[in-house]
Design a protein with these regions (language model features):
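Asp-based, Mg2+/Mn2+-dependent phosphohydrolase catalytic module
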Residues: 1-13, 48, 73, 124-224
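Active-site neighborhood of HAD-like aspartate-dependent phosphohydrolases
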Residues: 2-52
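Short, acidic loop-to-helix structural element flanking the phosphoryl-transfer center
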Residues: 4-5, 10, 88-114, 120-124, ...
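Conserved SAM-binding loop
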Residues: 15, 22, 96, 112, ...
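Short alpha-helical
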Residues: 28, 57-60, 102, 121-122, ...
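Alpha-helical substrate-recognition element adjacent to the catalytic core
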Residues: 31, 39-69, 75, 98
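Metal-dependent phosphoesterase signature
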Residues: 63-102
Length: 224
């Protein structure tokens, strides 16, 4: 364990990624991408392949799904189609991963925030629809700032707003962009092994890794 136990117990601010960390949105994202591809006359992609494209924002997701031959204009038009479809179907199949609700309930005494590369209005709508929004002091998305993760701007803002130093802040996510955002901001990092971005964690190992979010309150409370 890279984080000393005494430091784990003193964490004051917990910053969570959303897709692949708290919520399993894989099917709805895949359906939205494939509906977009169908609309523009392209063949559908597998759920697994689309999931591997998630994590750096909608424009990157759509661009990757369309392939290298797509022009910026093509991507922009397809992104508009995707956003419309997803806005109407984002909660068709999406729910929390096993143990997420229990873990968040145990962590409720600490300051918690969301920092995702997903557009902020979708993030808020999802969290409200799942009954989780009230647990978080701030919900920031990929269009909340001038830059997205792995840039540290969002984390720096959250630490400033919550008046918590970097050595008492933990970034929790499923992908390399979460870990690199944490490193760039000088905070501790926790990777979750169940998210669809988890294979990228080997490229930038987080300070700690967990298989289930219910492990986190145990670690922070010194029970594991």
């Amino acid at each position: 364990m890279a984080i000393p136990r005494n430091v784990l117990g003193e964490m004051e601010l917990l910053v969570f990624d959303l897709d692949g960390t708290l919520i399993d949105s894989e099917q709805d994202l895949a359906n939205s991408v494939n509906a977009t591809l169908e609309k523009i006359g392209r063949k559908p992609l597998s759920v697994e392949l689309i999931a591997s494209y998630v994590g750096q924002g909608v424009a990157v997701l759509v661009s990757r799904a369309m392939g290298a031959e797509a022009t910026p204009e093509n991507v922009e038009q397809a992104t508009e189609i995707f956003l419309k479809y997803y806005s109407e179907h984002m909660l068709d199949n999406t729910g929390t991963y096993p143990g997420v609700r229990e873990a968040l309930a145990e962590l409720d005494g600490r300051k918690m925030a969301i920092l995702t590369n997903k557009p902020v209005h979708f993030s808020r709508d999802l969290l409200e629809g799942l009954g989780l929004a009230e647990l978080f002091l701030q919900i920031y998305g990929g269009n909340s700032f001038e830059t997205k993760k792995p840039d540290p701007l969002g984390l720096n803002r959250l630490m400033e707003e919550n008046e918590v130093p970097a050595d008492r802040t933990l970034m929790i996510g499923d992908s390399i962009s979460d870990v690199m955002a944490g490193r760039n901001a000088g905070v501790w990092t926790c990777g979750v092994n169940y998210g669809f971005g988890a294979p990228t964690l080997d490229e930038a190992p987080p300070d700690i890794r967990i298989d289930d979010l219910r492990e986190l309150p145990k670690l922070l409370n010194g029970k594991s």
